[in-house]
Design a protein with these regions (language model features):
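Phosphate-ester processing/binding pockets and catalytic centers
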Residues: 1-135
């Protein structure tokens, strides 16, 4: 089976004044992806939002609370959608010189591996879409 995996991160920069990084992977069978896209666009339009705007959980506001609640209901009720998240704490205390060849990015990608490894099955194929890592 072919799966599509959408990955995103929060507080992933080395010097962003956060001691926590969160990585998330939402995935579904690729054949279900277009219907899920369509459903989410319809939810956006129902709430008067541009159907192509990027959903940002940091932008939740009282004025859009009904949209976000409906979106959450959609995710919880849709058995075709799956999610795995990883919360890495103590990011500000890491010893990259000792454990990561003095390379923060190496640690970052190790955490992505730990996020995705439990999802991946050898008998399946995957399209893994990772958000652009800003600097």
């Amino acid at each position: 089976m072919l799966y599509t995996v959408f990955c995103d991160e929060s507080c992933h920069l080395q010097k962003d004044n956060s001691s926590v990084m969160v990585l998330g992977a939402m995935y579904c069978l690729s054949e279900k992806r277009k219907q899920i896209y369509s459903d989410i666009r319809a939810i956006k339009e129902k709430h008067g939002l541009n159907s192509h705007f990027e959903i940002k959980w940091t932008k939740v506001s009282e004025s859009k609370i009904e949209f976000y609640l409906e979106l959450l209901d959609y995710f919880w009720e849709n058995s075709d959608l799956h999610y795995r998240g990883l919360v890495a704490t103590g990011k500000d205390k890491l010893n990259h010189a000792k454990y990561n060849n003095d390379d923060y990015d190496l640690w970052y990608y190790k955490m992505y591996f730990r996020t995705l490894d439990p999802i991946i099955r050898q008998e399946n194929e995957y399209h893994i879409l990772v958000d652009i890592k800003d600097t």
